[in-house]
Amino acid sequence: MAAKTKTLELEDNVFLLLEGNLKRIFATPIGYTTFREFQNVVFNCANGQQEIANFFFEMLINGKLTQELAPQQKQAAHSLIAEFMMPIRVAKDIHERGEFINFITSDMLTQQERCIFLNRLARVDGQEFLLMTDVQNTCHLIRHLLARLLEAQKNPVGEKNLQEIQEEITSLKNHFDELTKALQ
């Protein structure tokens, strides 16, 4: 971490201004535009000064004070970090990856001589979906997604991404081997 340098000169009311605007933003549910609203507030409170904007971003996203502050302002900064760092990080995740799957859970039911899976998918943005499958549909879905991974392997970026999850791919292979043995 870079050493803290001179004391950053900020207007006395800037932390109150930040706090009020952040409370307004987070008084409503977090959505795709929330992080952009946060960025606008930071730029407005920084009065167009990039150094101050960067300080606020580092402070509110990562919880770090990269420059010295006057004692009262330092206390106000820590208060803002404690109250708003986590909601800002969630807003950033939703802005960047809101439609990605965050969590999957499944329940299995037996119905008329068929296994039915109730698959619940939750996205990063909090939306949840129910996907009902049976054994045949589940196999079809796996085959489709596996074909997509094979397609990704033909792309340099996709190949790099697959290398990063090599252990998970090996785990999938082991599960397929276990299932194949059980069916023999």
Curated annotation (Swiss-Prot):
It holds the Pfam family CT_584-like. It comes from the Bacteria. Belongs to the chlamydial CPn_0803/CT_584/TC_0873 family. This is Protein CPn_0803/CP_1068/CPj0803/CpB0832.
